[in-house]
Amino acid sequence: MKKISAFIVFVLIAGAVSAQRDLAYKWSVTAEYGLSSLDGDGDSYIKQVYGTSVEYAFLPFAGIALDYYYFPLGGPAFTTNVNAASVNLTVNVNRLFFLDTDYKVILKGSIGYGIAGYTSKYISSTTPSQTSVSNSASSFPVLSVSVEYYLTKLFSVGAKSQFRPFNVNNLEGDPRYNLDNVYNDNIVGATLYLRFKFSNPD
């Protein structure tokens, strides 16, 4: 937590120092598609993931993004549908260190807080029974790293990896995993995305 707090403070201080520069405030939206998997207690398949995001760049190297993802997870004994959203601080690493330099390829990172609603269906392998669970969860820190390539001044494409830890232990819906004070369910994903900018980059 101290390292995360120090990182956020560093970004804000750097923003204040460069605030006198001619800043470009931009909105952008993305559409994403890729693969994801549940890192939980049981075996999990690699499944598809769909997502979208809206980002506001309040500094040339930093922004606030709101994202939404649909994760249709599954495994040999369960199916789980997760609707997840998060608000994130995004950082353009290239511009953080070289503010006045333009790049065709950029490296971005983000950290955020998320919430999710999910429905799980578990089928027992030992008895002919089925368990369904609907619940909510929170995620912190939601982490992502992406590489983005500018096609034009308005469009870019990218590849993103993300990690979402949850404050629950039973996204599979298996009653055996209903343990107190155990939080080890995570979603990992990799997506390709298309970004549209409403105003030209610097």
Regions found by a protein language model. Give the residues of each.
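Short glycine/proline- and aromatic-enriched beta-strand/turn motifs that initiate or cap beta-hairpins
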Residues: 19-55, 63, 118-120, 197-199
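Gram-negative (and chloroplast) outer-membrane scaffold detector with strong preference
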Residues: 56-127, 136-140, 188-200
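Extended low-complexity acidic/polar segments
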Residues: 52-60, 121-166
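Outer-membrane beta-barrel domain signature
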Residues: 39-43, 76-78, 98, 130-135, ...
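Cleavable N-terminal export/targeting peptides
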Residues: 1-24, 197-202
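Flexible, surface-exposed loop regions and adjacent strand-edge segments
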Residues: 46-47, 81-84, 124-130, 174-181
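Predominantly the C-terminal beta-signal and adjacent terminal strand-loop region
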Residues: 65, 72-82, 150-202
